[in-house]
């Protein structure tokens, strides 16, 4: 058979009742899935096979189901991703019998690994939109855990800008409190 789809990840939103979620791609073993949830506070939890979920449809070309032990709360998201180990387990001997299924599975696994690497590159990495671009595109995603800037051209965190703004506001208030004020509008401003 072939790996006839480029899909290697499915994502769903919980409704508080559903426990079964489809994955629409082939896996060679039930441990070849990475199942994660995202709560409404944007905390990511990696689920454990056998404890948090079970898998049906192993080695089916059109996929199977992840069955959660409890329903995913409303508003939570679930990601089901192929996570194939980077190993080569097919042993092909010289002068041995030719078993097409062994070759087919080995080539399928290579294709799955390429899809997995492509998925990481295309969906998760901060990258330039083109080789010609001189900037990185976050694709409308936030960037977390960024250090405070130390060089003039470094990116600044919200916390750093907020604290700098507070310092500036305090300086302006201090200067304003020491200024001479008159309420008559005909007096011109001092140089």
Question: Predicted segment positions?
Answer:
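Small/polar residue-rich beta-strand/coil "junction" motifs that cap repeat-based extracellular fibers
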Residues: 130-151
């Amino acid at each position: 058979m072939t790996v006839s789809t480029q899909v290697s990840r499915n994502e769903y939103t919980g409704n508080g009742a559903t426990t079964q979620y489809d994955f629409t791609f082939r896996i060679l073993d039930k441990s070849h899935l990475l199942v994660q949830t995202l709560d409404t506070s944007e905390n990511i939890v990696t689920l454990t096979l056998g404890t948090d979920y079970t898998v049906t449809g192993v080695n089916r070309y059109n996929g199977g189901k992840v069955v959660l032990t409890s329903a995913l709360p409303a508003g939570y998201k679930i990601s089901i991703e192929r996570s194939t180990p980077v190993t080569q387990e097919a042993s092909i001997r010289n002068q041995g019998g030719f078993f097409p299924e062994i070759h087919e599975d080995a080539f399928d696994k290579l294709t799955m690994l390429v899809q997995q690497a492509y998925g990481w590159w295309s969906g998760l990495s901060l990258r330039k939109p083109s080789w010609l671009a001189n900037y990185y595109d976050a694709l409308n995603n936030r960037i977390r855990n960024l250090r405070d800037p130390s060089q003039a051209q470094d990116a600044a965190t919200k916390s750093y800008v907020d604290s700098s703004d507070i310092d500036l506001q305090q300086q302006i208030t201090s200067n304003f409190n020491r200024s001479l004020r008159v309420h008559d509008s005909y007096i011109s401003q001092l140089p």
